[in-house]
Amino acid sequence: MYLIVSTLILLFLLISISYKINIVQYEIKSEKIDREMNILFLSDLHSCDYGINQKKLMDKIKSVDCDVILLGGDIVDDKLKPKKAFELLEQLQQLGKKVYYVHGNHEKRIENLDEIDKAIKNYGVQILDNEEEFLSNNIKLIGVDDSSGEILDDYENELDILDDNLNSENFNICLIHKPDYYFKKNLKKFDLMISGHTHGGQWRLPFIFNGIISPGQGLFPKYAGGIYNDDYTLIVSRGLAKEKTVVPRIFNRPEINLIKLTNINNS
């Protein structure tokens, strides 16, 4: 009996705990999209190790065709050394793609963040701190800095102003670490929000619940990972954290995301 139970437990662990990187793809259609574009999104690496020069991760990245790369925060961890994060940035630089980065809450906790940011920029990465960039004539990316360490009322007032000043004729993309301001409704005029932070709710049970716990959302979070369409579209990545996490990821493989933007009239 003991052998049977032990075997069943071992089988469960082998099936449920996997750190093989998943590529999750989404297609977003809008009449405001003026050119087809593939966006690669990575979030929540937390300076974790995917082999020498992040080979396991880079093999996945190189297997997809993308036009631009977005990094959604917590790429550099506040506890682990930044070496593995910098290895990733160095490898991304060699791809020759434009790379944009927003801070997450763990980067905002780093005491020498100015030095870390300088190193990030040396890899050709553009950090967006409540700043915007056009990815095409009509596709605008707005990178929003994380709220950690900020006075919350002032921060949310800035978000309201940013939201009010959007040009609705553009296809507006919000790159922000936490998805909280999607359901808090501070940012409600975008066409697409791309976030991470949740680590996929840590534990999942497919077809039953999508995550057990997430910071900012508590137990059984609605926005733990996937695509959502309430007022507009939200994509939440389950991210790449592994050895940094206190508990193992169960039925919750680390992931990167390929987001295809297409004009609705071309489909």
Residue ranges of each PLM-predicted region?
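Short, surface-exposed loop/helix-turn segments at secondary-structure junctions
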Residues: 206-219
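Short Gly/Pro-enriched turn/cap motifs at secondary-structure boundaries
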Residues: 16-18, 216-218, 248-249
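His/Asp/Glu-enriched short active-site or ligand-binding loop at hydrolase and phosphoryl-transfer sites
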Residues: 200-206
